[in-house]
A protein has these predicted regions:
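Phosphate/pyrophosphate-binding catalytic cores of soluble transferases and nucleic-acid-acting enzymes
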Residues: 1-159
Length: 159
């Protein structure tokens, strides 16, 4: 079965998940969009080598820091690791704060690949230009994402 433990940054999710996984003989699936990157151990509060020896972890260190790793790549990783199938045979605790990763798993999102031409054009725009473009095209931006230029840029690439 697949269980979820989500919450805000620095709320103790990782420690609670690790303790729960040991007590309940579970594996852990990281749903942290930064933990996928190698070398960001301190920034993302990745489990230590000792912790990883105690519990099977998925979703850690699967991309280089200079690699563009998208939600599509993450979902493909889940399929490559047989996570959907494994969740029928074993208990897996998905833990992290990346809401899009969690929603994509629960709601079975399907994403279209990004268009590199559009992305290149959008990267030339500044923050105010992107906001104006959103307004003109009536593309909503959640209030909590208004300060994230990457979110605003990538929203033009989504269907």
């Amino acid at each position: 079965m697949l269980y979820f433990l989500t919450g805000i940054t620095a709320s103790g999710k990782s420690d609670l998940a690790h303790k729960s996984a040991i007590e309940n003989n579970m594996s852990i699936l990281s749903v942290d969009s930064m933990a996928v990157y190698k070398g960001l151990d301190v920034l993302t509060a990745k489990p230590s080598d000792v912790m990883q020896a105690q519990v099977k972890y998925y979703g850690l260190d699967i991309a280089d820091c200079d690699q563009n790793f998208s939600i599509i790549d993450y979902l493909n990783y889940l399929i490559d690791q047989d996570i959907p199938e494994k969740s029928f045979k074993e208990d897996i605790l998905a833990v992290g704060g990346s809401g899009l990763y969690v929603k994509a798993m629960i709601d079975k999102y399907e994403f279209k690949p990004t268009d590199p031409t559009i992305r290149s054009e959008l990267e030339q725009l500044n923050f105010d230009q992107l906001l104006k473009f959103h307004e003109l095209n009536e593309i909503p931006i959640p209030d909590m994402e208004l300060n994230k230029i990457d979110y605003i840029s990538s929203s033009f690439e989504r269907p």
